């Protein structure tokens, strides 16, 4: 039993230095205990709600370790942004390919249109002759 108490005192001293819930409500950690609300021991921490022997005992409501997993998850989340960058890099390349294909298609259509204007030339002349008649209509308007 003496060894366990000595270990607790040692642990508490180290935690006090790190600022992990100093003292709390009870003597040996209390509510803050070994990590307080989000540290190494979750809500109850190392000493439970009241301390060394209180309601939570040496494990409290969440025990030692659950809080420690949280920081690990945060580290993994950092890997997300680099992954997001890769799709961004790929997108412009795809866009470029699309752009290259479109102008060629447009060129083809333009070529076809060039053949039509020659045929349209005759039609345009006919329209010019009709315009002469239109001048007459203009006089009628007067």
Curated annotation (Swiss-Prot):
* Cellular localization per UniProt: Secreted
Grouped into one coarse class, the protein's main location is secreted
Q: Which keywords, in A-to-Z order, does the entry hold?
A: Developmental protein, Secreted, Signal
- Gly residues compositional bias: what residue ranges? 65-77
Q: Give the range the annotation lists for the signal sequence.
A: 1-16
Region named Disordered: 65-142
Q: Where is the composition biased (Basic and acidic residues)?
A: 112-124
Instruction: Output compositional bias ranges, type Basic residues.
Output: 125-142
Q: Is Secreted there in the keyword field?
A: yes
Q: Which GO terms describe its cellular component?
A: extracellular region
As for what it does, the entry says: Likely to be involved in the establishment of the head.
Name used for this protein in its record? Protein spalt-accessory
Which source organism does the UniProt entry give? Drosophila orena (Fruit fly)
> What gene name is given for the protein in this entry?
sala
């Amino acid at each position: 039993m003496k060894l366990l108490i000595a270990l607790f005192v040692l642990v508490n001293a180290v935690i006090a230095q790190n600022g992990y819930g100093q003292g709390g409500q009870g003597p040996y950690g209390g509510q803050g205990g070994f990590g307080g609300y989000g540290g190494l021991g979750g809500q109850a921490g190392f000493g439970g709600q009241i301390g060394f022997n209180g309601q939570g005992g040496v494990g409290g409501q969440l025990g030692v370790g659950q809080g420690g997993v949280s920081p690990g998850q945060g580290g993994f989340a950092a890997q997300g942004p680099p992954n997001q960058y890769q799709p961004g890099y790929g997108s412009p390349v795809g866009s470029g390919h699309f752009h290259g294909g479109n102008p060629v298609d447009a060129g083809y259509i333009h070529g076809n249109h060039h053949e039509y204007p020659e045929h349209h030339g005759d039609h345009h002349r006919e329209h010019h002759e009709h315009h002469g008649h239109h001048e007459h209509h203009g006089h009628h308007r007067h």
